[in-house]
Amino acid sequence: MANTENCPKVGIVMGSDSDMPVMAKAADILEELGIPYEMTVISAHREPDVFFEYAKSAEEKGFKVIIAGAGMAAHLPGMCAAIFPMPVIGIPMHTTSLGGRDSLYSIVQMPSGIPVATVANAGLLAAKILATSDAELLGKLKAYSTKLKEQVEAKDAKLQEIGYKAYLEGMKK
C-alpha cells in the first residue's frame, strides 16, 4: 500500500515478497514522516524487461530516491543505481545459505561510478536526502529525533527510579 496523496518521491522495490517484512520498515517511517512512496516487487533476474522499465521510468515518476532490497545475488540495488541517476539505498536480505553475507557483498562492492548506499535505517536516510531541499520535512525529522531522545531519557529515568533488576524483569513481560 503506497501513500498516494502526492506523486511518490521514493520508490521501494524488492526482488521477492519474502523481503516485505524488512522493506515495510522503510515504508513505515516514510508514512510517519508523510513522504509519498511507491512499493513494488520486481525480480531483476526473472523479469528483466519489467525491471528495466521500472528503473528507466523512476525519474519521470518523480522519484528522488530508490530503496531496493534483494537477497542472494542481490543485483536489484546495483542495477537500479546503474540506470536511475539519483540516490539508491540498498538493503541486503538475510539468506539461508550464507546468512545474508552474499547479499551484502553484492550490494556494497559496486564498480566505480555506480554508488549504492547500504545502511540500516534506509527509510530515514531517504527522508534525510529529501530534507536537503524540503524545510517542512527537515522540521519533521528534527521532531522525530527529539522524540527518540525523549524516549531514551524516559527509559533512563525509569532505570534510575526502579533499578536494573526490576527494569530487566519489566522487559520480560
Predicted regions and their residues:
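Active-site rim loops that border cofactor/substrate pockets in soluble metabolic enzymes
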Residues: 33-63, 157
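Short glycine/serine/threonine-rich phosphate/pyrophosphate-binding segments
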Residues: 19-23, 47-51, 70-79, 98-101, ...
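Short, glycine-/small-residue-rich phosphate/pyrophosphate-handling segment
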Residues: 98-140
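Glycine-rich phosphate/pyrophosphate-binding loop and the adjoining helix
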Residues: 133-173
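Glycine-rich phosphate-binding loop
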Residues: 54-92
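Glycine-rich phosphate/diphosphate-binding loop of Rossmann-like nucleotide-binding domains
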Residues: 5-46
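Basic/polar N-terminal segments that are highly enriched at the extreme N-terminus
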Residues: 1-7, 173
